[in-house]
Amino acid sequence: MKGLLSLSVLPVLAYASPMIVDSIHQNAAPILSSTNAKDIPDSYIVVFKKGVTSTSALAHQNWVQDIHTSVESKRMKKRNQFTFKNEAFDGLKHTFDFAGGFLGYSGHFDEEVIEQVRRHPDVEYIERDSEVHTLKAATENGAPWGLARISHRDKLNFGTFNKYIYASQGGEGVDAYVIDTGTNIDHVDFEGRASWGKTIPQGDDDVDGNGHGTHCSGTIAGKKYGVAKKANVYAVKVLRTSGSGTMSDVVKGVQWAAESHLKSVAEAKKGNRKGFKGSVANMSLGGGKSVTLDRVVDQAVAVGMHFAVAAGNDNADACNYSPAGSKNSITVGASTLADERAYFSNFGKCTDIFAPGLNIQSTWIGSKHAVNTISGTSMASPHICGLLAYFLSLQPASDSAFAVAEITPAEMKENMISIASKDLLSDIPSDTPNLLAWNGGGSDDYKKIIGGARENDTTEFSSTLTEKLEKLAEEGLTAIYNELKDAVVA
């Protein structure tokens, strides 16, 4: 089998260890599948090689649909001639043309069709479509505490557990795309700032029939429950009422959100989006490992979207799941009120930061006033998405006289990690960053938040060193104490 795989796919497979090549043939694109996902029978995502143009991709898609129609016509004739059950195939489902960086399509194809597709010279690889779902959470009674936690450095106590300190303009001018089950956009906590963006599953209604997406939206931008209380919310429905969906629908949802963001950027440059400060996105969902989903999320980040994704609730390595394993998003684990890693939270080197995720109260479905308290990394990720919106809103607008260079997603990720509260959480594995999200303690000066956090790190180091020196003195090691103290002063 050596030498049969596309060289461009080999690094991807090395990175995505839970992916397997379950079908290899000479001069044919590999068919990939995840070891920890439930495949959808005869459903595939086809990805084109780099260099394939949009025109060539369209011609290919027309070609494959013609093949599908021909094969289905033959199948129908056989079904009419013989009395046996014969499955029908739907053909082309979604097409992907994402900012020039990702081209492909998905569909429901007969094996005869997919074998012809994989031998086409423009195809890099084919991935079996798989199920995606909300990250299951337990429902319990409780009160919100997550907002208070991200605005305090120290562990919460009776005087601080319900006090959220924040800049009042947090989220203003920022669009938040919630890629989930939808959002109860009429909920009073959104104050009219929530809109329906797009429903991806075919035949589904423009409504959140599950509640999961509404809960995430409330944590991001609700008046009472939100981190960034003035952000705009756009519902991107990729999961059905059951909380489940397909990987291809999620990929299409990410593409739609990124395209919407790029339209807003273009409108802002024309002067038609006054005060626009950028876009963030949240994905509190997961399935198995998907090279395609991770790649598409990274492409969305590359065009300027700030992405937060849930690490997952399997108490396992986040790198083995998607989109948790995407390189350029911020992957979020869940913490508790007692500053512990939540027992369900995934971990590992792909986890970038932790945020409150146990017993989080937020908006819900059923009425304009409904609330619910649930748990999961699904609840932690919206805290980070909200913080992304919050920090973006502290920048001057692009059309302002005080406009500054746009903060890239990579810079924002680095800054958020650099100011996080360090080494406060217990039960954190050695390969996992011990970082808890922090909002700057209510300051509305982003530069001071970033600079002040770094100064605090130096101060904390000096304070710790002084304490150790004092201990030496107490033990009677006066000479050593004086020598070291003089060195510190110098």
Curated annotation (Swiss-Prot):
Active site (record annotation): D180 (charge relay system), H212 (charge relay system), S378 (charge relay system)
Subcellular location: Secreted
GO CC entries: extracellular region
EC number: 3.4.21.-
Domain Peptidase S8 stretches: 144-450
Pfam family, one: Peptidase_S8
Any one of the GO BP annotations: proteolysis
Single GO term (MF): serine-type endopeptidase activity
Glycosylation sites: N282, N456
This protein's record includes keyword Cell division: no
Major location category of this protein: secreted
UniProt key word Protease: yes
Propeptide, residue positions: 27-134
Domain Inhibitor I9: 43-134
InterPro entries, per the entry: PCSK9_ProteinaseK-like, Peptidase_S8/S53_dom, Peptidase_S8/S53_dom_sf, Peptidase_S8_His-AS, Peptidase_S8_Ser-AS, Peptidase_S8_subtilisin-like, Peptidase_S8_subtilisin-rel, S8pro/Inhibitor_I9
Signal peptide: 1-26
SUPFAM superfamilies linked to this entry: Subtilisin-like
Enzyme's top EC category: hydrolase
Gene3D superfamilies: Peptidase S8 propeptide/proteinase inhibitor I9, Peptidase S8/S53 domain
Keywords on record: Glycoprotein, Hydrolase, Protease, Secreted, Serine protease, Signal, Virulence, Zymogen
Role played: Secreted subtilisin-like serine protease with keratinolytic activity that contributes to pathogenicity.
Family, per entry: Belongs to the peptidase S8 family.
PANTHER family per record: CEREVISIN-RELATED (PTHR43806:SF11), PEPTIDASE S8 (PTHR43806)
Name this protein carries in UniProt: Subtilisin-like protease 8
Source organism: Trichophyton verrucosum (strain HKI 0517)
